Amino acid sequence: MKDMSAAETDAAAGLAGATPRRRARPAVTVQYGVPRAGLPARASLERWARVALRRTADVTVRFVGAAEGRALNRRYRGRDYATNVLTFAYSAAGRALAGDIVLCAPVVAREARDQGKPVAAHFAHLVVHGLLHLQGYDHAGDEDAQRMEAAEKRILGKLGFSDPYGREG
């Protein structure tokens, strides 16, 4: 997927010609704990955040390798393996959203390959997934999971990506 201008992004998100509304102003910090080749650029991450967030946010996105991903998952979730994405929310009630999204680059790349998806689409899905967690979405129960998946599909569609679950509708 090519990088789009702000106007193209707004048009893709259904915002062009719409009644002006206050848009989220995400402050996105990017940390690369692994080589950058093949990873999303800051401009892409900012665009995804702009479309996914409903309010102002301060988000750090960190790309890590398998060892760091495994250590974080073990420390914070008690699971001794590298997972694709971890989200850490720091927001207090009534304050701007704040949090970290950690993506384990080799796990995301492997999953994309195994699922026959473009790597960029899988990164976009997992960043949106993390941004939804920062906004209070969860997938612990069936109803919550359905609500979160619907939001992911809607946002990714606005960004020009297909259904990450491979289902139509």
Annotate each predicted stretch with a short phrase.
Residues 1-124, 134-169:
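An acidic/histidine-cluster motif and surrounding catalytic segment
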